[in-house]
Amino acid sequence: MTPNKPTLHPRNRHQGRYDFPSLIKAHPDLARFTITNPHGKPSIDFANPEAVRVFNRALLKAQYGIQHWDIPADYLCPPIPGRADYIHVAADLLADDNAGDVPRGAQVRALDIGVGANCIYPLLGYSDYRWRFLGSDIDPVALASAKAIVQANGLGKAITLRQQANRAHILSGLLQEGERFDLTLCNPPFHASRDEATRGSQRKWKNLGKQDPKRKLPVLNFGGQNNELWCEGGEIRFVTQLIGESVQYAERVLWFTSLVSKASNLPGIEAALKKSGAKAVRIIEMGQGQKQSRMVAWSFLDDAARQAWHAQRKSQA
């Protein structure tokens, strides 16, 4: 398995092969999981959840200065290079309305919808751009894990966490009066049902030669709770609901964004965006190794209003 391809964003820190000696120096525990792949290069068993957790811990220490990171068993353990790409592509989106300059610092505020136990997007966004984050989730266990990560790294001023109390809503009832965000991020549940998630997991296990029939929900890149992997109606329903709810926050968010894994969902999403009255829509392809994805972004502000948003933020800095 080759973890990185040249399709990564130019600012992504994970170009080329992983530097295992540096990673092991940063986190010596990685040494016991390091193997030699069929090409004679150091690697890990990417089907081993514990190995991937330790590997991520080493990456975050060595590349981002995150000293403490862990997640509960059976929660999603994210592939960091792909997650970083989303942050960088979103940063470029903000730069487009800001004379080509990526806005940095605490004046930029992002909302991560479904922050998860791993808290990965706020960690990467803060490390690379010093943005402030609000992370939301419906799962109190995930939020407790994310809170432990934030506190252990002294990031309480940069990253705030909040539970979405109504599982039927995404944005509605979450934001407080007067809150404004430059950006929302979302990596929506991919599958439409538990059975579909299970089948997808088993296919990936089979491809890795590690299928485990004893699990009710096999590890899928590399773990994942039900609400992380599937929701009723799948990705298309989640994103179209997000679009519908975003209308009520049209003046309080500069850019709404979401990842979309299935290209076949794009026509339905584009139709929902047209119906919503969004004044700007972007679909940006993202290639990460063997996986192809894309970021869908929309704004209810026209070009002049978006540029004025950046100017106002600068005046308040």
Swiss-Prot record:
Q: Does the keyword ATP-binding apply?
A: no
Query: Mind telling me what this protein is named?
Result: Ribosomal RNA large subunit methyltransferase F
Q: Which reaction is recorded as catalysed by this protein?
A: adenosine(1618) in 23S rRNA + S-adenosyl-L-methionine = N(6)-methyladenosine(1618) in 23S rRNA + S-adenosyl-L-homocysteine + H(+)
* Top-level taxon: Bacteria
InterPro entries referenced in this protein's UniProt entry, alphabetically: METTL16/RlmF (IPR010286), rRNA_lsu_MeTfrase_F (IPR016909), SAM-dependent_MTases_sf (IPR029063)
Q: Which UniProt keywords apply?
A: Cytoplasm, Methyltransferase, rRNA processing, S-adenosyl-L-methionine, Transferase
Q: Which Pfam families match?
A: Methyltransf_10
Task of the protein: Specifically methylates the adenine in position 1618 of 23S rRNA.
Similarity field: Belongs to the methyltransferase superfamily. METTL16/RlmF family.
GO CC annotation, single: cytoplasm
Tell where it localizes. Answer: Cytoplasm
- Provide the primary localization: cytoplasm
- Gene Ontology molecular function, alphabetical: 23S rRNA (adenine(1618)-N(6))-methyltransferase activity
GO BP terms, alphabetized: rRNA base methylation
Organism the protein comes from: Pseudomonas putida (strain ATCC 47054 / DSM 6125 / CFBP 8728 / NCIMB 11950 / KT2440)
Enzyme Commission number(s): 2.1.1.181
Q: Does the keyword S-adenosyl-L-methionine apply?
A: yes
Gene that encodes it: rlmF
What Gene3D superfamilies would the database entry show? Answer: Vaccinia Virus protein VP39
